Amino acid sequence: MIIKSSEYAVSAVKEEQYPKDNLPEIALAGRSNVGKSSLINTLLKRKNLARTSSQPGKTQTLNFYLVNDDFYLVDVPGYGYAKVSQKRRQEFGEMIQDYLETRPNLKGLIILIDSRHEPTKDDISMYEYAQYLNIPILVVCTKMDKIKKNQTNKVMTGLRKKLDLNYDHVTVLTFSSVTKFHVTELGNWIEDKISQ
């Protein structure tokens, strides 16, 4: 996928605030601090388009990024951040649920999982929920530069077991925003989904 242009479009917490142009959308979901913003910046070759933070829980809205005037990448608030109140967590959950269930132009969901840790209950719930909704899924193991090369197979085996992955239906990629590992494959998956 060749990136010609990319820009922040809008932040939304409800359907009335979503873009109205019916362009296809690819959403990114994952735990707080898993690397969603870094993945967006790396993929779009922009240093600070999506704000990165070492402090978890910074993204609190659905952030839409217009790419090539052709489709949107949608950064979803991170889940599993303990320092957010129960009420706020519930609001995030409802916002994400409404988006995933009602958005007809959602063409795929990229679920990011930190390669240094096993998938959490929240990761598993998000994966199963997306499957239930029949949303095409790409699972991305982030921060691969932080683990030793000889640990890759162990990480992938653990992920496959924990999520009960069937590779016929779900694509899995390892990824690093530092080394740019699998950026091309990520772009190809997105291109395939938005063209369907």
Swiss-Prot record:
One of its GO terms (cellular component) is cytosol. Mg(2+) binds at residues 37, 59. GTP binds at residues 30-37, 57-61, 75-78, 142-145, 175-177. Necessary for normal cell division and for the maintenance of normal septation. It comes from the Bacteria. Residues 22-196 form the EngB-type G domain. HAMAP family: GTPase_EngB. Its cofactor is Mg(2+). GO terms for biological process: division septum assembly. It comes from Lactobacillus acidophilus (strain ATCC 700396 / NCK56 / N2 / NCFM). Keywords: Cell cycle, Cell division, GTP-binding, Magnesium, Metal-binding, Nucleotide-binding, Septation. InterPro entries: G_ENGB_dom, GTP-bd, GTP-bd_ribosome_bio_YsxC, P-loop_NTPase, Small_GTP-bd. One of its GO terms (molecular function) is GTP binding. The keyword Amino-acid biosynthesis does not apply. This is Probable GTP-binding protein EngB. The keyword Cytoplasm does not apply. Belongs to the TRAFAC class TrmE-Era-EngA-EngB-Septin-like GTPase superfamily. EngB GTPase family. The gene is engB.
